[in-house]
């Protein structure tokens, strides 16, 4: 186990180091932001209109053609909001200081352009299965767009491991540990219950997935927002000082913390961007799709980035 931990730590330090994922993903986000002329700003109002115009608990159901705009947003938010948005932010704050929160916000802004580009490609290269359902994603546009099937296969293997094993393990472990510490519930029992509930949703297909998420996500979002507003209201006097620490810590972490935690600007950027990208999944191509004009669905998809962006 110690050897496995050491291996994971080494790989993590390399992947999230100075010359790999952080500059690559931020660079891609900056490129798409400039190339698309700040699409996340120009089309934000239109994305809200298209998405929440279909907000209904008894609206259109998912079928062969996929999901409604709100169902797509709900499914994307359900996948993106989780441990990374709560524990990840706390970890970034601890490891990178208050300034890490500023870089989380920057990662969220750039990520909206990245996920817009992802969704455009997914819309352009999606196909209809023999069963009639529409499917798409990075594996399809890598294979058909780049004409590189080996890379598409490699991506598919990686995304299965990331979403099917690693991501689910982190979320389920956090839930099980929380119930165990708070109520003394056995972790194995919590895991079994989660597996059964998830299986019932998963094997129900796209229609059941969309139906469940469009009902649960508004409740989840409301609890998340109300909880955040309550904390802000009860600590109103700390809001301005907190913002000052965040902005100052983004460029001079030692001055913001008095040198207590001993972080540098490089570490603030590294932990802020890493936790921001982990929380929102930009660059993974995990956004749901439907057969509509690519740019319209993409605006809805980019909105999920903003709605699931970690708060401080």
What would you call each of these model-derived segments?
Residues 32-33, 107-132, 138-173, 177-202:
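Helix-loop-helix module between adjacent transmembrane segments
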Residues 138, 175, 201-218, 238-243, ...:
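Hydrophobic, small-residue-rich membrane helices and short re-entrant helix-turn-helix hairpins
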Residues 24-28, 35-48, 174-179, 186-247:
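Membrane-interface loop-to-helix entry segments
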Residues 118, 309-312:
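Short alpha-helical transmembrane segments in multi-pass integral membrane proteins
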Residues 22-27, 67-74, 148-162, 192-193, ...:
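Select transmembrane alpha-helical segments in multipass membrane proteins
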Residues 1-78, 83, 93-100, 111:
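N-terminal alpha-helical transmembrane segments of multi-pass membrane transport
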Residues 214, 219-287, 306-307:
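Membrane-embedded translocation segments of transport machinery
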Residues 57-95, 121-139, 143, 157-160, ...:
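Alpha-helical membrane segments and immediately flanking helix-loop junctions
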């Amino acid at each position: 186990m110690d050897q496995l931990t050491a291996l994971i730590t080494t790989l993590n330090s390399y992947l999230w180091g100075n010359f790999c994922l952080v500059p690559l993903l931020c660079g891609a986000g900056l490129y798409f932001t400039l190339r698309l002329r700040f699409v996340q700003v120009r089309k934000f109002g239109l994305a809200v209109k298209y998405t929440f115009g279909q907000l209904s608990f008894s609206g259109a159901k998912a079928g062969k053609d996929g999901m409604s705009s709100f169902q797509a947003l709900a499914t994307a938010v359900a996948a993106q909001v989780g441990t990374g948005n709560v524990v990840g932010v706390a970890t970034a704050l601890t490891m990178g200081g208050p300034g890490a929160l500023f870089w989380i916000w920057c990662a969220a802004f750039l990520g909206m352009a990245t996920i817009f580009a992802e969704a455009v490609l997914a819309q352009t290269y999606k196909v209809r299965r023999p069963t009639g359902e529409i499917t798409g994603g990075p594996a399809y546009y890598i294979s058909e767009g780049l004409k590189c099937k080996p890379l598409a296969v490699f991506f598919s293997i990686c995304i299965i491991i990331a979403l099917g094993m690693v991501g689910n393990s982190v979320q389920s472990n956090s839930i099980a540990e929380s119930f165990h510490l708070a109520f003394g519930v056995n972790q194995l029992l919590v895991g079994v219950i989660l597996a059964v509930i998830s299986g019932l949703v998963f094997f129900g297909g796209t229609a059941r997935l969309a139906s469940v998420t469009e009902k649960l996500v508004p409740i989840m979002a409301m609890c998340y927002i109300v909880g955040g507003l309550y904390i802000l209201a009860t600590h109103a006097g700390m809001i301005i000082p907190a913002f000052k620490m965040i902005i100052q810590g983004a460029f001079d972490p030692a001055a913001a913390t008095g040198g207590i935690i001993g972080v540098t600007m490089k570490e603030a950027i590294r932990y802020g961007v890493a936790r921001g990208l982990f929380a929102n999944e930009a660059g993974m191509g995990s956004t749901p799709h439907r057969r509509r004009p690519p740019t319209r669905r993409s605006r809805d998809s980019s909105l999920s980035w903003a709605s699931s962006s970690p708060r401080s």
